[in-house]
Protein backbone atom coordinates (compact mmCIF):
# COMPACT_ATOMS: atom_id res chain seq x y z
CA UNK A 1 0.00 0.00 0.00
CA UNK A 2 3.01 2.29 -0.25
CA UNK A 3 1.54 4.28 -3.14
CA UNK A 4 -2.17 3.61 -2.51
CA UNK A 5 -4.47 6.44 -1.58
CA UNK A 6 -6.19 6.25 1.81
CA UNK A 7 -9.50 5.86 -0.05
CA UNK A 8 -8.26 2.78 -1.93
CA UNK A 9 -6.75 1.29 1.22
CA UNK A 10 -9.97 1.92 3.18
CA UNK A 11 -12.07 0.28 0.46
CA UNK A 12 -9.75 -2.76 0.42
CA UNK A 13 -9.81 -2.95 4.23
CA UNK A 14 -13.60 -2.88 4.31
CA UNK A 15 -13.79 -5.55 1.59
CA UNK A 16 -11.30 -7.75 3.46
CA UNK A 17 -13.39 -7.46 6.64
CA UNK A 18 -16.56 -8.28 4.68
CA UNK A 19 -14.98 -11.29 2.97
CA UNK A 20 -13.41 -12.62 6.19
CA UNK A 21 -16.76 -12.30 7.97
CA UNK A 22 -18.55 -14.09 5.12
CA UNK A 23 -16.07 -16.98 4.98
CA UNK A 24 -15.24 -17.41 8.70
CA UNK A 25 -18.55 -16.33 10.18
CA UNK A 26 -17.15 -13.50 12.28
CA UNK A 27 -15.14 -10.34 11.72
CA UNK A 28 -11.37 -10.40 12.23
CA UNK A 29 -10.15 -9.16 15.62
CA UNK A 30 -6.67 -8.19 14.48
CA UNK A 31 -4.93 -6.82 11.42
CA UNK A 32 -1.57 -7.49 9.81
CA UNK A 33 -1.03 -6.09 6.33
CA UNK A 34 2.71 -6.69 6.05
CA UNK A 35 3.24 -4.15 3.30
CA UNK A 36 1.43 -1.23 4.84
CA UNK A 37 1.36 2.46 4.07
CA UNK A 38 1.89 5.37 6.40
CA UNK A 39 -1.91 5.38 6.76
CA UNK A 40 -2.58 1.71 7.58
CA UNK A 41 -2.62 1.84 11.38
CA UNK A 42 -4.59 5.09 11.38
CA UNK A 43 -7.17 3.64 8.99
CA UNK A 44 -7.49 0.51 11.15
CA UNK A 45 -7.94 2.69 14.25
CA UNK A 46 -10.57 4.80 12.52
CA UNK A 47 -12.36 1.63 11.42
CA UNK A 48 -12.67 0.77 15.10
CA UNK A 49 -13.19 -2.97 14.73
CA UNK A 50 -9.70 -4.28 15.53
CA UNK A 51 -8.52 -5.20 19.02
CA UNK A 52 -4.97 -4.93 17.71
CA UNK A 53 -2.83 -4.13 14.71
CA UNK A 54 0.42 -6.06 14.20
CA UNK A 55 2.04 -3.85 11.55
CA UNK A 56 5.02 -2.82 13.65
CA UNK A 57 8.39 -4.27 14.54
CA UNK A 58 9.11 -1.44 16.97
CA UNK A 59 9.07 -3.11 20.39
CA UNK A 60 8.94 -6.25 22.55
CA UNK A 61 5.72 -5.21 24.27
CA UNK A 62 2.39 -3.95 22.97
CA UNK A 63 1.78 -0.22 22.94
CA UNK A 64 -0.98 2.26 22.22
CA UNK A 65 -1.18 4.77 19.38
CA UNK A 66 -3.56 7.72 19.11
CA UNK A 67 -5.20 8.96 15.92
CA UNK A 68 -7.52 11.86 16.66
CA UNK A 69 -10.18 10.39 18.93
CA UNK A 70 -9.22 6.80 18.06
CA UNK A 71 -6.86 4.71 20.20
CA UNK A 72 -5.27 1.63 18.65
CA UNK A 73 -3.39 -1.15 20.41
CA UNK A 74 -0.34 -2.39 18.51
CA UNK A 75 0.92 -5.92 19.20
CA UNK A 76 4.28 -5.91 17.38
CA UNK A 77 5.43 -8.49 14.85
CA UNK A 78 9.05 -9.55 14.38
CA UNK A 79 11.47 -9.75 11.51
CA UNK A 80 14.45 -11.14 13.42
CA UNK A 81 12.94 -14.18 15.19
CA UNK A 82 11.33 -15.11 11.90
CA UNK A 83 11.73 -18.20 9.73
CA UNK A 84 11.76 -15.94 6.64
CA UNK A 85 15.46 -15.57 7.44
CA UNK A 86 15.91 -19.09 6.05
CA UNK A 87 15.13 -17.56 2.64
CA UNK A 88 17.44 -14.53 2.81
CA UNK A 89 21.21 -14.01 2.70
CA UNK A 90 22.76 -13.65 6.16
CA UNK A 91 19.80 -15.52 7.56
CA UNK A 92 19.53 -18.91 9.21
CA UNK A 93 21.37 -21.75 7.47
CA UNK A 94 20.25 -24.60 9.71
CA UNK A 95 17.56 -25.44 12.20
CA UNK A 96 20.26 -25.28 14.88
CA UNK A 97 20.98 -21.63 13.98
CA UNK A 98 17.27 -20.83 14.31
CA UNK A 99 17.03 -22.64 17.66
CA UNK A 100 20.11 -20.86 19.05
CA UNK A 101 18.80 -17.46 17.99
CA UNK A 102 15.37 -18.10 19.49
CA UNK A 103 16.96 -19.41 22.69
CA UNK A 104 19.25 -16.37 23.03
CA UNK A 105 16.34 -13.99 22.40
CA UNK A 106 14.14 -15.84 24.88
CA UNK A 107 16.84 -15.83 27.57
CA UNK A 108 17.24 -12.04 27.37
CA UNK A 109 13.49 -11.37 27.36
CA UNK A 110 12.85 -13.87 30.17
CA UNK A 111 15.55 -12.25 32.30
CA UNK A 112 13.98 -8.82 31.70
CA UNK A 113 10.55 -10.17 32.63
CA UNK A 114 7.17 -9.09 31.33
CA UNK A 115 8.14 -9.22 27.67
CA UNK A 116 6.58 -10.67 24.56
CA UNK A 117 8.52 -12.84 22.13
CA UNK A 118 6.94 -12.96 18.74
CA UNK A 119 8.13 -15.63 16.30
CA UNK A 120 7.22 -15.24 12.64
CA UNK A 121 6.43 -18.61 11.03
CA UNK A 122 5.48 -19.60 7.48
CA UNK A 123 4.36 -23.15 6.56
CA UNK A 124 6.53 -23.28 3.42
CA UNK A 125 9.65 -22.50 5.46
CA UNK A 126 9.20 -23.90 8.97
CA UNK A 127 7.34 -26.93 7.67
CA UNK A 128 10.58 -28.67 6.66
CA UNK A 129 11.58 -31.51 9.02
CA UNK A 130 14.90 -30.10 10.29
CA UNK A 131 13.41 -26.69 10.83
CA UNK A 132 10.26 -28.08 12.47
CA UNK A 133 12.45 -30.01 14.91
CA UNK A 134 14.29 -26.82 15.83
CA UNK A 135 10.97 -25.11 16.57
CA UNK A 136 9.78 -28.10 18.60
CA UNK A 137 13.04 -28.04 20.60
CA UNK A 138 12.69 -24.31 21.24
CA UNK A 139 9.08 -24.64 22.40
CA UNK A 140 10.14 -27.38 24.83
CA UNK A 141 12.98 -25.17 26.08
CA UNK A 142 10.74 -22.14 26.62
CA UNK A 143 8.04 -24.29 28.21
CA UNK A 144 10.56 -25.59 30.75
CA UNK A 145 10.70 -22.10 32.32
CA UNK A 146 8.26 -21.01 35.01
CA UNK A 147 5.60 -18.47 34.10
CA UNK A 148 5.91 -18.68 30.32
CA UNK A 149 2.63 -18.11 28.51
CA UNK A 150 2.08 -19.23 24.92
CA UNK A 151 -0.67 -16.89 23.76
CA UNK A 152 -2.40 -15.81 20.59
CA UNK A 153 -2.18 -12.17 19.55
CA UNK A 154 -5.82 -11.80 20.55
CA UNK A 155 -5.06 -13.12 24.05
CA UNK A 156 -2.09 -10.76 24.31
CA UNK A 157 -4.24 -7.83 23.17
CA UNK A 158 -6.98 -8.66 25.67
CA UNK A 159 -4.46 -9.02 28.51
CA UNK A 160 -2.62 -5.81 27.62
CA UNK A 161 -5.81 -3.78 27.27
CA UNK A 162 -7.04 -5.05 30.66
CA UNK A 163 -3.77 -4.48 32.52
CA UNK A 164 -2.47 -1.42 30.63
CA UNK A 165 -5.50 0.57 29.52
CA UNK A 166 -4.68 3.53 27.34
CA UNK A 167 -4.43 6.91 29.03
CA UNK A 168 -4.39 10.09 27.01
CA UNK A 169 -2.05 12.88 28.04
CA UNK A 170 -1.85 16.44 26.85
CA UNK A 171 1.04 16.75 24.46
CA UNK A 172 2.98 20.00 24.32
CA UNK A 173 2.99 19.82 20.52
CA UNK A 174 -0.82 19.83 20.53
CA UNK A 175 -1.27 22.67 23.06
CA UNK A 176 -1.85 26.30 22.25
CA UNK A 177 0.96 28.63 23.26
CA UNK A 178 -1.14 29.99 26.11
CA UNK A 179 -1.90 26.52 27.49
CA UNK A 180 1.72 25.44 27.18
CA UNK A 181 3.02 28.52 29.00
CA UNK A 182 0.38 28.18 31.72
CA UNK A 183 1.34 24.57 32.43
Question: Residue spans of the language-model regions?
Answer:
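Loop/helix-junction capping segments adjacent to catalytic residues or to phosphate/diphosphate-binding pockets
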Residues: 3, 38, 128-129
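Active-site-adjacent pocket scaffolds in enzyme catalytic domains
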Residues: 18-22, 26-113, 161-169
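C-terminal domain-boundary segment and adjacent tail
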Residues: 99, 103-183
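A generic secondary-structure micro-motif detector
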Residues: 6, 30-31, 128
